[in-house]
C-alpha cells in the first residue's frame, strides 16, 4: 500500500462553519460548496472572491451568499467545471509544496513561465482560460 498524503482540507469545513454569520449544518452544504469554502480558507481569500473563481459576476454575489448559507445549490456546468480545475490546482500545489504557507506565497508571486503574471491574479480574473493556464502550469511543475 502506497503513501497517502494527508488531506489538504482536514477540518476546514468545521472552521468555516464557525466563521459564517449564521450557523450552517455541514449536512446542508453540498460537497462543491464545502470544497470552495475550504479553498477560500486555504488560500486566505474572502467569500467575495468565490464569485470570480466560480465565474459569476458581481451582480450574483447575493446568490453566492445564499449558496454558502445552504439556502441555494451551486448549479451550472461552468461552475462545476471550474471547481474541478480548482480542485486539481489545489491538489497539485499540495503535492508539490506540502506546506500551505509556501503554497500561498507561490500563488502570490510573479511566475516567469506565466510571463511574469501572478497565479492568484489570473485565478481571480474569472476567466476559465486563465484557470486552465494556471492548472497546466502547475501540473507541468509536478510532472502530471
Positions of the model-derived regions?
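Non-transmembrane "mature" sequence context
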Residues: 1-144
Amino acid at each position: 500500500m502506497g503513501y497517502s498524503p494527508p488531506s489538504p482540507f482536514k477540518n476546514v469545513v468545521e472552521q468555516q462553519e464557525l466563521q459564517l454569520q449564521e450557523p450552517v449544518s455541514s449536512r446542508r452544504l453540498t460537497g462543491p460548496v464545502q470544497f470552495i469554502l475550504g479553498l477560500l480558507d486555504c488560500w486566505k481569500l474572502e467569500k467575495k472572491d468565490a464569485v470570480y473563481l466560480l465565474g459569476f459576476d458581481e451582480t450574483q454575489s447575493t446568490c453566492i451568499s445564499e449558496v454558502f448559507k445552504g439556502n441555494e445549490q451551486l448549479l451550472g456546468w461552468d461552475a462545476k467545471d471550474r471547481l474541478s480545475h480548482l480542485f486539481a490546482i489545489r491538489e497539485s500545489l499540495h503535492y508539490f509544496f506540502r506546506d500551505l504557507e509556501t503554497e500561498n506565497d507561490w500563488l502570490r508571486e510573479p511566475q516567469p513561465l506565466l510571463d511574469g503574471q501572478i497565479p492568484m491574479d489570473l485565478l481571480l480574473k474569472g476567466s476559465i482560460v486563465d484557470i486552465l493556464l494556471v492548472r497546466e502550469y502547475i501540473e507541468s511543475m509536478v510532472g502530471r
